[in-house]
């Protein structure tokens, strides 16, 4: 099993909308998805050892599935260790909160631990502009001052950043254009684990 970082490079030119339809390209199937999760867990263990001073926080709404999956896998590898994992909502910290025509509905924050002085690993399924992570950083500081903050992303859409934010742990890197969309499916909510790139192509 090859557990090296997967990089997908795509060079597709946008076409006129009137002649476009959507095409799916599977970046990670179920098997590669699981291998990627396991690799990320091994990388976390290298840096966090027994996790006695570390906590995992999934960013609502989709990052929580990644955080839960990583926590489950870590508990299998380290059954005698206390892996602390929580969910954090960032709705009121988004920079577009008051700019949207429709009101945003906040999700639930679940963190039954203290982050003060801890090493925090923020997790999200797709890293794109970086604005979600900026909001997460601000929201997190409302709960305390961590010793260190790291970022784990299942998918890193490189070259799409609006803010200077880079992940510490990456499952898969994707070079894509703005008209393309990365969709992460989870067996818990979608019936299967998969990462798909949606691209507009000529009919």
What are these regions (language model features)?
Residues 5-203:
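PRPP-associated nucleotide enzymes
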């Amino acid at each position: 099993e090859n557990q090296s970082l997967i990089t997908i490079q795509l060079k597709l030119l946008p076409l006129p909308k009137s002649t476009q339809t959507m095409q799916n390209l599977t970046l990670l199937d179920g098997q590669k998805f699981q291998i990627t999760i396991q690799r990320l867990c091994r990388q976390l263990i290298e840096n966090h050892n027994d996790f006695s001073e570390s906590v995992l926080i999934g960013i609502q709404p989709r990052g929580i599935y990644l955080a839960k999956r990583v926590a489950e896998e870590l508990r299998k590898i380290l059954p005698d260790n206390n892996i602390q994992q929580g969910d954090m909502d960032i709705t009121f910290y988004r920079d577009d909160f008051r700019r949207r025509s429709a009101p945003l509905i906040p999700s639930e924050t679940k963190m039954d631990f203290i982050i003060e002085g801890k090493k925090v690993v923020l997790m999200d399924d797709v890293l794109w502009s970086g604005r979600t992570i900026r909001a997460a950083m601000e929201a997190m500081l409302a709960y305390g001052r961590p010793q260190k903050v790291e970022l784990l992303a299942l998918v890193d859409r490189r070259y799409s950043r609006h803010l200077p934010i880079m992940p510490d742990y990456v499952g898969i890197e994707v070079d894509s254009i703005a008209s393309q969309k990365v969709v992460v499916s989870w067996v818990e909510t979608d019936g299967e684990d998969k990462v798909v790139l949606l691209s507009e192509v000529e009919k």
